[in-house]
Amino acid sequence: MNGTFFNHTVFTHGVLLNRSQELAGTLVDCCTGNGSEVTANDGGGSLVLAQDERKLFVTRVVQIAVLCVLSLTVMFGIFFLGCNLMIKSESMINFLVKDRRSSKDVEAVMIGLS
């Protein structure tokens, strides 16, 4: 039982290493230009993408667009919430100022100064 478990983990570990080495090789080929390159058919005008790449590109563009819309929504929400709170605080301050009564001591000082 232990021998088969050990062999299974060694096998799985070897497969993981092979996949990571393949991934590393692909990344190195991509960065150095040794791998398969995307070429244009009409002299550099437009790139012809495979169907999977096209779907991935469209998915990424849609994700970016949705993220931009959500970011703008949050920014405008914070802005308008802040403006609304500022307006309410100004009206509350005006309400409190109108309800304030001056004390008799202040009136006496004002009469004494004039």
Curated annotation (Swiss-Prot):
- InterPro entries of this UniProt entry? Reprimo_fam
Q: Which UniProt keywords apply?
A: Membrane, Transmembrane, Transmembrane helix
Q: Which residues cross the membrane?
A: 61-81
GO CC terms: membrane
Q: Where in the cell is it found?
A: Membrane
- Mode of membrane association: Single-pass membrane protein
Q: What family, per the record?
A: Belongs to the reprimo family.
Question: Which PANTHER family does this UniProt record tie to the protein?
Answer: PROTEIN REPRIMO-RELATED, REPRIMO-LIKE PROTEIN
Instruction: Output this protein's name.
Output: Reprimo-like protein
Q: Which organism is it from?
A: Danio rerio
